[in-house]
């Protein structure tokens, strides 16, 4: 938003987009890179590493966020220099990976880490749990960097549907490439149909809700994780309305004990993660809860809760103990700090144009 008036900031964001697509072109399956080809990072992992790659846990959202940033920069400033040949090549690679991973059984991607922490590696010789075709695209890991239990991560597929719409618009109105437009349209349609036909389950009351993960063979997880994209964030991402009935039923379910990562204690209640201890809720999840409700008093309650549970640091943490906020992970967490600021803006009806 500030970039609308600040050309230097807009140029910086554009440079960031260009750097992200530079890395995507090195390997669209990697989730973290080195500043230079120095061989740092998890080089002992059993996957196709190179000196540029820090870690190669494949996560759908790693490919969605750069598209979102490129599009929102254009939408809010009119800037288009980020749509350069590197961007175009990166989009082709992203579309190729999304298509390949619709049929993961024939994918070249595998990942094994020598570790005692099961969330840091994929079962089945690095291929993950077995899946069958649904139209959705497979993900090895969640936004938390923890392994998926089932391969079709529904909120990340929701995010993919949204950004494929961005790709379609960019290549129709700014860049003229009918082949990319057609491929994006087909993928968007197939993934959306996959979510609607296979990405839902029922809660304990028998109500239809969105599952967090499915395998296409009848297995599904009823849960949500704090890291975004998650199911709570579906309206924030632009996938659906805050008032969609299936979303509301999903939301009510996930903000209850039916979600194994929902915790309630003396000082707070909210969603945590497999990535942090039990009874720890995440400020990111609390902020997202606030940004996906139309109730202004609820937004205010959550803002006050976040301020009251910062353990006197005046910063947001990764997670904190619902019974003792003095116990927390990460003294400061940039992502959570940003989400708190965005919730403040949201409360005052200041929002990025999407």
Provide a role label for each language-model segment.
Residues 27-32, 96-116, 152, 162-245, ...:
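Catalytic cores of carbohydrate-active enzymes
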Residues 155:
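Active-site-adjacent mobile loop/cap segments within catalytic or ligand-binding domains
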């Amino acid at each position: 938003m500030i970039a609308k008036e600040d050309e230097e900031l807009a140029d910086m964001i554009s440079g960031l987009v260009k750097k992200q697509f530079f890395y995507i072109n090195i390997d669209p399956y990697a989730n973290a890179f080195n500043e230079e080809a120095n061989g740092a990072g998890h080089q002992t992992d059993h996957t196709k590493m190179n000196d540029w790659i820090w870690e190669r846990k494949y996560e759908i959202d790693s490919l969605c966020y750069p598209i979102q940033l490129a599009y929102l920069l254009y939408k809010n400033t009119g800037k288009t220099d980020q749509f350069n040949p590197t961007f175009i090549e990166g989009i082709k690679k992203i579309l190729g990976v999304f298509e390949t991973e619709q049929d993961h059984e024939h994918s070249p991607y595998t990942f094994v880490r020598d570790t005692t922490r099961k969330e840091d590696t994929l079962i089945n010789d690095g291929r993950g749990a077995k899946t069958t075709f649904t139209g959705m695209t497979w993900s090895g890991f969640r936004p938390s960097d923890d392994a998926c239990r089932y391969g079709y991560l529904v909120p990340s597929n929701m995010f993919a549907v949204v950004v494929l719409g961005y790709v379609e618009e960019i290549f129709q109105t700014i860049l003229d490439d009918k082949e990319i437009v057609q491929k994006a349209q087909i993928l968007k349609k197939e993934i959306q149909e996959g979510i609607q036909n296979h990405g839902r389950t029922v809660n304990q009351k028998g109500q239809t809700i969105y599952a967090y993960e499915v395998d296409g063979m009848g297995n599904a997880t009823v849960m949500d994780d704090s890291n975004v994209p998650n199911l709570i964030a579906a309206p924030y991402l632009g996938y659906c309305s805050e008032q969609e009935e299936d979303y509301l039923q999903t939301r009510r379910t996930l903000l209850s004990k039916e979600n194994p990562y929902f915790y309630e204690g003396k000082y707070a209640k909210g969603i945590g993660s497999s990535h942090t201890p039990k009874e720890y809720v995440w400020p990111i999840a609390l902020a997202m809860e606030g940004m996906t409700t139309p109730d202004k008093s609820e937004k205010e309650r959550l803002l006050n809760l976040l301020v009251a549970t910062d353990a006197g640091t005046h910063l947001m943490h990764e997670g904190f103990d619902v019974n003792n906020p003095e116990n927390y992970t990460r003294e400061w967490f940039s992502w959570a700090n940003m989400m708190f600021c965005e919730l403040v803006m949201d409360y005052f009806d200041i929002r990025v144009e999407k």
